[in-house]
């Protein structure tokens, strides 16, 4: 499949693509520049597409990105804050749940919201295609 994202409506190439997204961002402030309005418009569309993809893949819970690999201190702190926000738990409780979950954010969230252990949380995630919201039901 060939897809096209263009700020040039009715371009010749759009006639041969399977999916065409055309943005009419109007003329650039500086003629010949493609990094101002049209580049910004394309970036916004790509951000929307990637956000929708993350939601459909179950990598979010509410407005939180919860499918996070903790590989450094900064990401560890982010994971703690995500668990806190998702559950309303204290920082200490979020840290404990993350530790007991093997540093899996989704597992820690389920552990705290459902008051279950890590193994049961993982089982519920597997049964719900790794989606936190569905695993809660």
Mark where each language-model region is.
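Short, amphipathic alpha-helical interaction segments embedded in low-complexity terminal/linker regions
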Residues: 48, 53-137
């Amino acid at each position: 499949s060939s897809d096209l994202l263009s700020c040039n409506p009715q371009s010749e190439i759009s006639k041969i693509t399977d999916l065409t997204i055309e943005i009419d961002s109007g003329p650039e402030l500086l003629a010949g520049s493609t990094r101002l309005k049209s580049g910004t418009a394309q970036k916004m569309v790509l951000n929307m597409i990637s956000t929708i993809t993350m939601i459909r893949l179950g990598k979010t819970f509410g407005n939180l990105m919860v499918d996070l690999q903790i590989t450094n201190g900064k990401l560890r702190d982010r994971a703690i804050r995500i668990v806190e926000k998702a559950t309303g738990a204290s920082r200490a409780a979020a840290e404990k749940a993350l530790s007991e979950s093997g540093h899996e954010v989704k597992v820690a969230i389920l552990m705290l919201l459902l008051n279950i252990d890590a193994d049961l949380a993982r089982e519920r995630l597997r049964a719900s295609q790794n989606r936190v919201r569905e695993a809660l039901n």
